[in-house]
């Protein structure tokens, strides 16, 4: 089985794949202060709680936007699985032609999402990822990564409002029934949630115009708060909560032959 690991600024999501089918997945908090031993114990416990054996993992692929965590995490995986994990970056085959001024600047998570979205839904398309940052990525009909937009995530905006405005409380990210609100809490919730709906609709519509194509441009959303925003807009066609994990599985398969050769050599 293949373990795929998506390291984000807020959460680490792990998925276990067998023959490209998701067997199980787990979500843990990203913590740069955790040691490799702590990560090793935590990951092993996740497997045990699910009735799985970590020793069934043949190989591991990681996508990360948090460089400071990689030493501890990679060391933990080497210890648990006895493999050197494949890390998405330069030299890893993705099948995506990146049309960025500096391709190295594109976050691994954005590339992984693009791979999965184009494979599953074709192009042209826009991928919106509601993570710590909200990212919008444009992929052409030929599977080229054209570029995109990065904006503060919904939770970042909510936390900033609480931290910078002395009289405003921290609020739960839920959708109030209207925008003419009668309390401070519901007023903040309406501003955050419906404000983000407006942001998403505007950027998606502007991106579609910049594509300058006649064919339909599909919009695929992923990330923890994608369902919340999707419930208030018509501009999202598909919500795919496992998009990043599937992208990692696909990228692994595109590098499988080379990986198998490396693993065989290391075991010789």
UniProtKB/Swiss-Prot annotation:
One of its GO terms (molecular function) is ATP binding. Pfam families: Pan_kinase. Belongs to the type III pantothenate kinase family. Its main location: cytoplasm. One of its GO terms (biological process) is coenzyme A biosynthetic process. ATP binds at residues 6-13, 132. It comes from the Bacteria. It catalyses: (R)-pantothenate + ATP = (R)-4'-phosphopantothenate + ADP + H(+). This is Type III pantothenate kinase. Keywords: ATP-binding, Coenzyme A biosynthesis, Cytoplasm, Kinase, Metal-binding, Nucleotide-binding, Potassium, Transferase. It is an enzyme of class 2 (transferase). Homodimer. The active site is at residue 109. Its cofactor is NH4(+); K(+). It is found in: Cytoplasm. K(+) binds at residue 129. A monovalent cation. Ammonium or potassium. The gene is coaX. The keyword Nucleotide-binding applies. The lineage of its organism: Bacteria, Bacillati, Bacillota, Clostridia, Peptostreptococcales. Catalyzes the phosphorylation of pantothenate (Pan), the first step in CoA biosynthesis. Its EC number is 2.7.1.33. InterPro entries: ATPase_NBD, Type_III_PanK.
């Amino acid at each position: 089985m293949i373990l795929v690991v998506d390291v984000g600024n807020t959460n680490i999501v792990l998925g276990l794949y067998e023959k490209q089918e998701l067997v199980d997945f787990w979500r843990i908090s990203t913590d740069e202060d955790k040691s490799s031993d702590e990560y090793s114990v935590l990951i092993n416990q996740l497997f045990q709680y699910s009735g799985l054996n970590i020793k069934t993992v043949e190989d591991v692929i990681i996508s990360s936007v948090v460089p400071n965590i990689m030493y501890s995490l990679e060391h933990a995986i080497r210890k648990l699985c006895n493999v050197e994990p494949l890390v998405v970056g330069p030299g890893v085959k993705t099948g995506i032609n990146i049309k960025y001024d500096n391709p190295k600047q594109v976050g691994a998570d954005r590339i992984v999402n693009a791979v999965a979205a184009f494979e599953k839904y074709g192009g042209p398309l826009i991928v919106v990822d509601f993570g710590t940052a909200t990212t919008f990525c444009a992929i052409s009909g030929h599977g080229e990564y054209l570029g995109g937009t990065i904006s503060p995530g919904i939770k970042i905006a909510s936390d900033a409002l609480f931290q910078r405005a002395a009289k405003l409380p921290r609020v739960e990210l839920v959708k109030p029934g209207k925008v003419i609100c009668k309390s401070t809490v519901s007023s903040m919730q309406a501003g955050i949630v419906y404000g983000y709906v407006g942001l998403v609709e505007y950027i998606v519509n502007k991106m579609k115009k910049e594509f300058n194509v006649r064919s339909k441009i599909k919009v695929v959303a992923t990330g923890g708060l994608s369902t919340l925003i999707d419930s208030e807009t018509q501009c999202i066609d598909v919500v795919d909560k496992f998009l990043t994990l599937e992208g990692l599985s696909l990228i692994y398969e595109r590098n499988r032959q080379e990986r198998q050769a490396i693993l065989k050599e290391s075991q010789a």
